[in-house]
């Protein structure tokens, strides 16, 4: 069940160039959130009407807190980067579905860029039931590696080769001989497309979380659809609403 509430910022810090980590005290959202879901964050600036979708990085259900990690890319995130402890933050969530967790299977978690944060909570939820291996892809500057390492083995790929394998997450998987029974992935579309092809070629179940600009965040406006293999019951055409039907899909369900 989704909730709209005025939450409180607990803390915020910069963890890499242009990347911020914020902990939020919520009333109901944290208690119900699972790995793979997101929240919509509303701007204080009245000229910016649409909320910004941000994936959930971590959840502490006992304390009723959640963490978001985001990159500053425009007016909304620039505003948010100025929030300090005690500030109100208007949010809606938890939204979307979560990853379908498979027990008893060796998992490969793959995150690219700002698609890395959801892998922190997913690893926390999976580590007690499966072997967790995380492959994280960066342009150059690393973040969240300490959190990822608490959940299992971590393999790094950087575009410039400054850390780990030089190249893509697929290059790192091959170079480090990472194997598994199921892949969970989040990141830019070209990365997800390559992961889908790799999973298909190696007969591995693959779940992908799609990143897309959103408007309503609840499936009403059809502003964030993607092409799907089957017809959508809502529109009777071959598409899926990323905010409502996703953001997590089985890779074979959607076209990238």
In which residue ranges do the predicted regions lie?
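N-terminal [4Fe-4S]-dependent radical SAM core
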Residues: 47-49, 200, 253
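Local cysteine-cluster metal-coordination motifs and their immediate loop/turn environment
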Residues: 118, 212-247
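Short, basic/aromatic-enriched C-terminal tail that caps enzymatic domains
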Residues: 1-3, 239-256
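Ferredoxin-reductase
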Residues: 2-85
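FNR/FR-type flavoprotein reductase catalytic core
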Residues: 75-213
């Amino acid at each position: 069940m989704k909730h709209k509430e005025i939450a409180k910022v607990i803390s915020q810090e910069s963890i890499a160039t242009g990347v911020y980590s914020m902990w939020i005290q919520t009333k109901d959202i944290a208690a119900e959130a699972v790995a793979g879901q997101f929240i919509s964050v509303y701007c204080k600036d009245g000229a910016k009407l649409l909320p910004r979708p941000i994936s959930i990085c971590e959840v502490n259900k006992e304390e009723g807190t959640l963490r978001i990690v985001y990159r500053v890319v425009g007016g909304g995130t620039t505003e948010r980067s100025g929030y300090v402890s005690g500030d109100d933050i208007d949010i809606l969530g938890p939204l979307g579905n979560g990853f379908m967790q498979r027990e008893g299977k060796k998992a490969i978690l793959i995150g690219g860029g700002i698609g890395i944060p959801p892998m922190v909570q997913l690893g926390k939820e999976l580590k007690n039931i499966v072997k967790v291996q995380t492959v994280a892809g960066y342009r150059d500057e690393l973040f969240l590696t300490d959190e990822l390492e608490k959940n299992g083995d971590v393999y790094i790929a950087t575009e410039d080769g400054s850390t780990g394998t030089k190249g893509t997450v697929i290059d790192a998987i091959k170079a480090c001989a990472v194997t598994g029974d199921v892949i969970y992935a989040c990141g830019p579309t070209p990365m997800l497309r390559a992961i889908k092809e790799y999973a298909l070629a190696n007969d591995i179940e693959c779940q992908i979380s799609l990143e897309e600009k959103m408007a309503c965040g609840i499936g009403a406006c059809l502003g964030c659809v993607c092409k799907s293999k089957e017809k959508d019951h809502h529109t009777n055409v071959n598409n899926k609403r990323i905010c409502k039907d996703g953001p997590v899909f089985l890779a074979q369900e959607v076209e990238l």
